[in-house]
Amino acid sequence: MKSLFVSSSVGIAALALGTSLALGSAAAPARPASPVPVVPLDIARIFWEFNSSANDLGVHVFLDGEDWKFLRIKNPNNNVIFQVKGSGPYQELGMTELFFEGAEPSLDEVPLQDLLAMFPEGEYDFEGRTVDGEVIEGDAIFSHAIPDGPDVSATVVSPDLLEISWSPVVAPPPGFPAELIQVVEFQVIVESFQVTVPASVLSVTVPPQFVATLAPGEHQFEVLAIDASGNQTITEGSFVK
């Protein structure tokens, strides 16, 4: 009788221990996966460039970030519109800055509304991976607020003194979307000379030291009106030295 009691006690204890172990095992929570670090892009820009003299329009992209090996851009509809992947040494070392220009078709050949529809307004997502396996990302708001081209002129005051002037810009070009235009800067380019000035400035005197280096004859220049959205419009001009 004693041995039967002892056996029963041992069996009950073993059962209790087994139950305890089973419950302990079931109650142990799963360890959550470690989140992948996210690195922000230093620069993520997408913008229109319209040449009012040539009547062509295209989309430019500029981005900058540390040591990425893969990157893609999605439009507001979540469609991938651009993708780049490094190979060989670029897969191992990564890339940083990237600037590219899309083709700029003439609006005489590609209707404006068709081109605008290819690149809808809204938020464009930039996302990729660094060489360390981290996520790198950024976003940019893309607008159809495209400024008109300024009226430009150039005056050669003396052989080495050149003044370039232009008109204010407060509206889009005729036929473009009726968006609010807020020009924040103008940029002047004369061959290798380049300067950017606030929107309140409407003329630039090109340094005579630079003008002196130009050969006699006709030379081209550009004035860009740059909107707060980042979109910009070029007007071309020329002068004779």
Give, region by region, the residue ranges found by the protein language model.
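Conserved aromatic anchor
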Residues: 61, 160-180
